């Protein structure tokens, strides 16, 4: 039985972010739909060929998405919210963009669908909306068209589908409450139709992603798998695909299904390969996810070989990435500025494909010399002086309980803060960033390339900060921000100023839609050699009598949005970052900054997928935040910001953060998230986001007032703040001014209505 290689998916955006540029050009009206579609075709063809050349035997098709693969599945099923539908009932790419963004070059603008995190990653998906009695039909044939493309190019392929049970699990009911699982019988005919079309094209295997099978599901959902897959069986071979966790707890459900193979994540799961082999049906193929799709580290292939070699010849076996390579940058070979030693520790998506090919060849032949050669830099790294810092390790070991305690409880601090700031009712603020204009990006790029000296760069940044303060004072905001003109990314900026991180030139990964991020890589112990944000915060405060917030990214978010080390625990990394940023809080306070925001949007996304593992994570995650913040005096107000979150199941931990003010993203969920805070009787102040910054639509004063009144039904008005959902970095100034003016007006109206 010859072992084959495959990947579960490949990065979509292109090495130079070609997809992002084509999307944004099309949205802005600067290019045609045909030009956008052509870029997609070119990227798919290139990526298939690159994977093939790197040694992948079965290429994934259907992993490409114009915005997000869950949204693609919604269109496949004809699940289009009424507000986004075309008058004639047709579905096109602008339908997709209206659902994701709220607007597109054609069609009427409408509220974008809710967006949330894809399991415990920093990728986002558009949440499917379900209503009672909903009908489904095949309306979007993107998958079939891409299969035809790949077949025409002569590739051996494996189409990828999001499974029906997981699709329903990821969605939300809108309107009259009902059990969305009852829709399963209605979407299965569409899946049957798609599988029949694939069978007509000679497809042998289909990868069907059922990530819900790694979760602690209610019994009714587990019971739904058998009848669903009984309905889907028989047309093609189904590779039941799971990742991000192990499957052993749900293995009884899995082995009862009429599938022909199972993919397991052997990186993030705790599954025992021998047990899987023993319990799986003898005729099932096992796809072993041995290469980590979520990081940038070179794999120890000798270790991977030892892990799986015992199964060679005993059952059909494929070797694969643990999950889609969507979460990894594309190609390490173009990183020309990385230190040679550090570069030898890494592998990006194409290199991971090469790792799979090396592993396949060794397993098929029994020859392991190439694996040992590939793995040599990993052994060298364990002893590198770039990894270990004795002073950091000593400070970490000396942490005590007192280091995570503010001087006094919230009630005492709140009195001191009210006396200091004298803010009005319904105080208005923003979350931190202002539009990153072409001028700002050009300024940073010129400085980075050496075309601008430090003095001229600083003068330019200072001018943009000054303009941000002027804009906010004109608008009448109560608590200001400096706008973050000097920051390229909320995590990358801090990583650039902390020892223990390195950066790539082209290490882009998709976050959502056209948004890409370039995560820093944690290669060693973390420390702060000098203040990071103090200079610009102090300058901004000198320009106004109103309070200006200091802006920090919190330790858990920096951890979650970086590629972490694999030789120490995530807890260790988070606490090292917390200690470094604790010193930053102290320095901001000493510089006269009275309000300091520590953003933790990733706190919930870092949760383990199984609830039984949550407590340990939340304990150290909360402790890291408190270590970061607890150095602040009573009269210093600590804010935190979170987004895309469901809070009801972690409210104990949200309260335990002990932030004086929390701002959250609520507008897309129509203030639904506040139910958690109301039910828990959240004791501190809260700023529910009143408009969606991910959409270019400008909210009306009436819309914002209505949301705030709804918020005041759940949270006492004297503890409410008024703010957008998130930072304004990706928006333009015209819509930003208009939206903030309406937000301030709504707050003033509510003050006068008291």
UniProtKB/Swiss-Prot annotation:
- Annotated binding of L-homocysteine, by residue: 431-433, 484, 599
The record lists the catalysed reaction(s) as: 5-methyltetrahydropteroyltri-L-glutamate + L-homocysteine = tetrahydropteroyltri-L-glutamate + L-methionine
List the disulfide bonds in this chain: none
Instruction: Kindly list the positions annotated as binding Zn(2+).
Output: 641, 643, 665, 726
InterPro entries associated with the record: Cbl-indep_Met_Synth_N, Cobalamin-indep_Met_synthase, Met_Synth_C/arc, UROD/MetE-like_sf
Q: Which domain of life is it from?
A: Bacteria
What are the recorded Gene Ontology BP terms? methionine biosynthetic process; methylation
For the keyword Methyltransferase, the answer is yes
Question: What cofactor does this one take?
Answer: Zn(2+)
Its biological purpose is as follows: Catalyzes the transfer of a methyl group from 5-methyltetrahydrofolate to homocysteine resulting in methionine formation.
PANTHER family according to UniProt: 5-METHYLTETRAHYDROPTEROYLTRIGLUTAMATE--HOMOCYSTEINE METHYLTRANSFERASE (PTHR30519)
What name does this protein carry?
5-methyltetrahydropteroyltriglutamate--homocysteine methyltransferase
Gene name of the record = metE
């Amino acid at each position: 039985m010859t072992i084959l290689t495959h990947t579960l998916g490949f990065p979509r955006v292109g090495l130079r972010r070609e997809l992002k540029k084509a999307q944004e050009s099309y949205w802005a009206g600067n290019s045609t739909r045909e030009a956008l579609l052509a870029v997609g075709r070119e990227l798919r063809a290139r990526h298939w060929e690159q994977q093939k050349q790197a040694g992948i035997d079965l290429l994934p098709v259907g992993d490409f998405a114009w915005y997000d693969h869950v949204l693609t599945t919604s269109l496949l099923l004809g699940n289009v919210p009424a507000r986004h539908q075309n008058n004639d009932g047709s579905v096109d790419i602008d339908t997709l963009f209206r659902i994701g963004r709220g607007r597109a070059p054609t069609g009427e603008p409408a509220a974008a669908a809710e967006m949330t995190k894809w399991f415990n990653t920093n990728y986002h998906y558009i949440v499917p909306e379900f209503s009672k009695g909903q009908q489904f039909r095949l309306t979007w044939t993107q998958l079939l068209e891409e299969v035809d493309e790949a077949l025409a190019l002569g590739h051996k392929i494996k189409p990828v589908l999001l499974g029906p049970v997981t699709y329903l699990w990821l969605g939300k009911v809108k309107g009259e409450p009902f059990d969305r699982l009852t829709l399963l019988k209605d979407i299965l005919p569409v899946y049957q139709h798609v599988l029949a079309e694939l069978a007509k094209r000679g497809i042998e295997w289909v990868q069907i992603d059922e990530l819900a099978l790694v979760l602690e599901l209610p019994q009714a959902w587990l019971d739904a798998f058998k009848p669903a897959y009984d309905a889907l069986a028989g047309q093609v071979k189904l590779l039941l695909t799971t990742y991000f966790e192990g499957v052993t707890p749900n293995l009884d459900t899995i082995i009862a299904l009429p599938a022909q193979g199972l993919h397991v994540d052997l990186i993030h799961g705790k599954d025992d390969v021998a047990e899987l082999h023993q319990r799986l049906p003898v005729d099932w193929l096992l796809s072993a996810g041995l290469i980590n799709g979520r990081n940038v580290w070179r794999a120890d292939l000798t270790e991977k070989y030892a892990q799986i070699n015992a199964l060679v010849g005993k059952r059909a076996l494929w070797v694969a990435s643990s999950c889609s390579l969507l979460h990894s940058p594309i190609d390490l070979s173009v990183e020309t500025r990385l230190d040679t030693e550090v570069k030898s520790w890494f592998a990006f998506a194409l290199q991971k494909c090469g790792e799979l090919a090396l592993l396949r060849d060794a397993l098929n032949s029994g020859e392991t010399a190439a694996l040992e050669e590939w793995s040599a830099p990993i052994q060298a790294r364990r002893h590198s002086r770039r990894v270990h810092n004795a002073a950091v390790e000593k400070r970490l070991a000396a942490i005590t309980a007192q280091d995570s305690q503010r001087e006094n409880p919230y009630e005492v601090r709140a009195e001191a803060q009210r006396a200091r700031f004298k803010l009005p009712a319904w105080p208005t603020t923003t979350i931190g960033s202002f539009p990153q204009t072409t001028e700002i990006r050009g300024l940073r790029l010129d400085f980075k390339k050496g075309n601008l000296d430090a003095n001229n760069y600083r003068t330019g940044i200072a001018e943009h900060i000054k303009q941000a303060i002027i804009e906010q004072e004109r608008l009448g905001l109560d608590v200001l921000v400096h706008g973050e003109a000097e920051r390229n990314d909320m995590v990358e900026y801090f990583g650039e100023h902390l020892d223990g991180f390195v950066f790539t030139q082209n290490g882009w990964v998709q976050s959502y839609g056209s948004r890409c991020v370039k995560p820093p890589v944690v290669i060693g112990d973390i420390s702060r050699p000098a203040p990071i944000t103090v200079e610009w915060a102090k300058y901004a405060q000198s320009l106004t009598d109103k309070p200006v917030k200091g802006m920090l990214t919190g330790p858990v978010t920096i951890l979650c949005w970086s590629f972490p080390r694999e030789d120490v625990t995530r807890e260790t990394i988070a606490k090292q970052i917390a200690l470094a940023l604790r010193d930053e809080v102290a320095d901001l306070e000493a510089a006269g900054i009275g309000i300091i925001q520590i953003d933790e949007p990733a706190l919930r996304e870092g949760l383990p997928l199984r609830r039984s593992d949550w407590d340990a994570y939340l304990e150290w995650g909360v402790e890291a935040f408190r270590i970061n913040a607890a150095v602040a005096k009573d009269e210093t107000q600590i804010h935190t910001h979170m987004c895309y979150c469901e809070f009801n199941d972690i409210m104990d931990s949200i309260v335990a953060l002990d932030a004086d003010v929390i701002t959250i993203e609520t507008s897309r969920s129509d203030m639904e998230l506040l139910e958690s805070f109301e039910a828990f009787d959240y004791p501190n102040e809260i700023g529910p986001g009143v408009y969606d910054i991910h959409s270019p639509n400008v909210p009306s004063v009436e819309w914002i007032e209505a949301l705030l009144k709804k918020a005041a039904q759940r949270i006492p008005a004297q503890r409410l703040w008024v703010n957008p959902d998130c930072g304004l970095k990706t928006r333009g100034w015209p819509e930003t001014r208009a939206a903030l003016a309406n937000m301030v007006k709504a707050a003033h109206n509510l003050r006068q209505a008291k």
